[in-house]
Amino acid sequence: MINDGLEKLKTSYAENEIIEGEYDVSLSSKCYNGTFVGKVEDDVIAFKGIPFAKPPVGELRWKRPEKVEESKNVYQAYHNGKTPIQTEWKTERASYYRQGEDCLYLNIWVNRTCKDEARPVMVFFHGGSYGWGGTADPLYDGHNFVLSHPDIILVTVGYRTGMMGFVDLSYLEGGEDYPDAPNLGLLDQIEALRWLNQNISSFGGNKDNVTIFGESAGGGSVSILPIMDEAKGLFKRVICESGGLALTSSKEECKPFTDMLIEHSKAKSMKDLLSMSEEELMAVNEKINMYNVFPQRDGRLIPENPYHAYEEGKAKDIDILIGTNANELNYWVGELGGIIPYRFSMPIKFENDIAKLDEKNKANVKKFMKGLSGHSIWRISEFYNEIMFRLPSIRQSDDHKKNGGKTYMYYWTEPSGLKFRKACHAVELAYVFGNLDDTIYTGDRGDEQFAQTVQQMWTNFARCGNPSTDDIEWDEYTVENKETMVLCKDCHMENNIKNNQRELLSDLLDKFINPIYASLSYNVPFVWKSIIKIFLIILIIIAIILIIF
């Protein structure tokens, strides 16, 4: 049973229509594909559901996005565009909004009290393991953010996810004609940036001062875009929240997901897949959306080794602010159904993953675990915190800095009020957007002053490339000291956080560009298999007790 908020999302979809009569010109912006009329509240104009590419349907299914057609029509920009095809999931609230293939739309928030015609632009790409998420999630609403920072223009972007945005189709007959399919979601993001480059000045934005930022898969996206040739010149700065380069795939690692698509769709060729209706695709997606998909290191769009691309200076002209949360993995306590399934399933996964390592790395992991305190489940969580999130971010920062790239790092420790979550994955989003009443990850309403500090840091970085505030000096990152801003109510700088831990696990990053063994998703098979095993064991014990007594 979904709650009232999700029920409201399910029924709130509406199409933006052509405006035939009069409209308020002060609420409109003229773009090459039409004039868009927004809605105003508290002097913040929201333009929602603006198309930035042709709908990727029909012959354009699984094709790279194409430039949207020109238009002289006047359109409403009142409603979010559709959410990309995905499985409904309680914490991915956009999944309860209307879904569809036609999902390439963006939202823009502008404060009309600011008359500056060249304002910094911040473009947000949502997270969701590259398989979920959308602009309709209320957590990403930009009203409060732009109300507090009138000189900033905020944009949120929809892009194809899961089997529509990150699937290798080369294993099917005719699939050779779809070489971009494994990275379509990223190409969608680039097309949105192209549209903004051409049109954001109509909203008062400066096309030469664009900061892209994202969390989780969105953070991964904004780490990859700087090393993609097609994205060059479209943005100046990057803020990566709990993302990084670790979760990408080789061609071989993409094949199991393609095999599942073939199995459940019964398709033997691209002709078969293209003949399927949207409803049929959604039904197939329900069966395979539980598995992780990541962008593919194809050597064409994305370098085969993203770290080397940073090391070679491919992104040296981009300013980067990057960081992770202290207890990222605790997020999955909620995703996996509570502390009990988390407590029983994670050790099974950990043992399976460690069994794949060579003896040297097994010994290092064992030493790493012995150096931690607390219950074994939280020590296991700390291992995944490091290998999935923090260490890849440090490696990326080191490689970027070696070539003179301006870099800032943070470590988020402000906890969630939800039980067992601590400073979990996604907890910072309510603070960043200023949506403190949205407590889905924070549990309680966050501290207003701390939220203002975080937003000031993010927006200062977008304005000038330095996140320092009037009260807090944020030192630039160096390879030697690894200067890091600890983000909490008492923000402060620390150097070389958990240095000894990092040294023990550093070889794993060299060995595995993609620590696929360490990746988690919402319905990961190991969790349900382990839960079933536990349930069967309990049943056997109960049966034995009944027989004995």
Predicted regions and their residues:
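Surface-exposed patches in mature extracellular/periplasmic domains of secreted proteins
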Residues: 208-210, 268-272, 276, 409-411, ...
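Juxtamembrane boundary at the C-terminal end of a transmembrane helix
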Residues: 547-549
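Substrate-gating cap/lid region and adjacent catalytic-acid/histidine neighborhood
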Residues: 272, 278-448, 457, 534-543
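A structural signal for well-ordered alpha-helical segments within the folded catalytic domains
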Residues: 45, 100-104, 187-194, 220, ...
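Short, solvent-exposed turn/loop segments enriched in Gly/Ser/Thr/Pro and often Arg
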Residues: 160-162, 213-217, 411-419, 473-481
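Non-catalytic accessory segments of hydrolases
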Residues: 2-186, 207, 441-454, 462-473, ...
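Non-transmembrane alpha-helical segments in soluble domains
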Residues: 122, 153, 190-193, 197, ...
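Serine-hydrolase-like catalytic core of hydrolytic proteins
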Residues: 89, 93-270, 308-332, 402
